[in-house]
């Protein structure tokens, strides 16, 4: 029988910083869980494109927004805003940016393993 495992995001296994943001990552078994913080003025295509090396974000995100607002634009053209309390699924092939003057904090249940890493 397996034991219960606990980790705390206040003591992440890894913190990846990038212009105007960071992602704090904990790994538990096969799960990689992230808490991402994006400052006002953050935009994926301006802050992470050169780090990752792809034309748009190719990470799949399943997440929950704690605070702030983010606008997501898919490569195919559809757009959506997400904010506090929203649970979202965002497939690969998108740009995103912060809306307003409040930092956006979101938990990512699927994309933290590779987010903000060179493709």
Regions found by a protein language model. Give the residues of each.
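Conserved short histidine dyad/triad with adjacent acidic residue
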Residues: 35-56
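Short acidic-glycine-tyrosine-enriched beta hairpin
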Residues: 74-93
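Glycine- and acidic-residue-biased ligand/ion/polar-headgroup-sensing regions
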Residues: 31, 50-76
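Ligand-binding loop in jelly-roll beta-barrel domains
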Residues: 91-117
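Short beta-strand segments
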Residues: 34, 78-80, 105
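A short, N-terminal "cap"/entry segment at the start of jelly-roll beta-barrel domains
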Residues: 1-37, 45
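Short beta-strand segments in beta-sandwich/barrel cores
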Residues: 43-44, 68-73, 96
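Conserved GNAT-family N-acetyltransferase fold
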Residues: 36-38, 63, 88
